Structure formats: C-alpha cells, structure tokens
Amino acid sequence: MQVLVRDNNVDQALRVLKKKMQREGIFREMKQRKAYEKPSVRKAREKAEAVRRARKQARKTAIREGLIAAPKPKPRAVAPRRPAAAPAPASSPTTTA
C-alpha cells in the first residue's frame, strides 16, 4: 500500500493511510490474527457474519419496499443549558441609628 507525502505533511499522509487500511479491512484482519483461531470456530464466526449480513440486507430491502417502517432516528444528546446568570442584587446602604 502506498501513500504520497505532499509538502512534508506526514499527518495528512497518516490519515490517508489509516483510511485506506480501514477500507481494505487490514485492521480487522490484524486483530483476528493476533491469536490462533480453530477452523471450527472460524467457520462458525464466518457463518454468523453471513447470517448477520443477510438479515441486514433483508431489513434494508423491506424498508425500501415499504413492508416495514423505518426505525425512528435516535434523539441527539443535547447538553443541558446553563441558567442565565442572575444580576447581582443592588446593595442598599445600611443606616445605623
């Protein structure tokens, strides 16, 4: 995999490299190859992934065809608003009698 570094901008080149690696699935493969995976476990995992993909595709097709309603969008987290600072009370001169 090759990435061009333009104008000595290494940060941008790293971002491009990471994006390419993510797209190619290299990070996922590296994570899987950290430890040995028995062939039976590998087959079970790949089968589960295939089932998951098929379900997702069927769900998207059903939504597109109008057979089921699209899921409601999740509400965005909104930071609580701070109350406006109350004006300081005017100090009245105290009289001592």
Curated annotation (Swiss-Prot):
Pfam family, one: Ribosomal_S21
Ranges of biased composition (kind: Low complexity): 76-97
This protein's GO CC annotations: ribonucleoprotein complex; ribosome
Region feature (Disordered): 37-97
A Gene Ontology molecular function term of the record: structural constituent of ribosome
Keywords linked to the UniProt accession: Ribonucleoprotein, Ribosomal protein
BP GO annotations: translation
Similarity comment text for this entry: Belongs to the bacterial ribosomal protein bS21 family.
Name of the protein described by the UniProt record: Small ribosomal subunit protein bS21
Source organism: Methylobacterium sp. (strain 4-46)
Lineage: Bacteria, Pseudomonadati, Pseudomonadota, Alphaproteobacteria, Hyphomicrobiales
